[in-house]
Amino acid sequence: MTSLQQELKKKKPFDMPEQEALLNLLRTADQLQIRFARLFRRFGLTPQQYNILRILRGEGKPLPILEIASRMITVVPGITGLIDRLEAAGLVNRKRCENDRRVVYVCISERAVDLLGEIDEPLMDMHKALLGHLDPHELGTLSQLLERAREPLVAEPAEV
């Protein structure tokens, strides 16, 4: 196992442990995102488009655009554009709320549900390939540490 310092060919040690941990987190996230993007591209999706479809399938009913945006894994400034592209591909439909015409609901199509069904197994395989070397206790600890690391960020939402 190589350290981040070796991986980055950094001559001097990191200035402080927080810096090393944060750079480790960013490096790991980047490597994971590359692999997930490659998988979703095989199915004609971006990770953000997949995330929207996953949210809609999980909810089981249409959701307002702002509700979808609040549930995204990554902050997305152009969610309307993402939904436009999903609609053009026949993966979602929009419906205006009858009680409040300003609210637009997004519905997942059967075609999208079928597409997600095709993605499910390769995605689970990828989860196992990327983190299967960690035992359940280590995975739990990792999740807890990441949640703790996010705590100061929850009170201060990210701006795009």
Model-assigned labels for residue ranges:
Residues 84-144:
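Charged, amphipathic alpha-helical coiled-coil/dimerization segments
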Residues 32, 72, 115, 119-131, ...:
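Alpha-helical linker/hinge and terminal dimerization helices associated
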Residues 65-66, 77, 84, 104:
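Residues within helix-turn-helix
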Residues 20, 24, 51-54, 114, ...:
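Pre-recognition alpha-helix immediately N-terminal to the DNA-recognition helix
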Residues 1-43:
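N-terminal leader segment of winged-helix/HTH proteins
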Residues 1-14, 137-160:
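C-terminal regulatory/oligomerization modules of transcriptional regulators
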Residues 26, 30, 34-75, 158-160:
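N-terminal helix-turn-helix DNA-binding core of bacterial DNA-binding proteins
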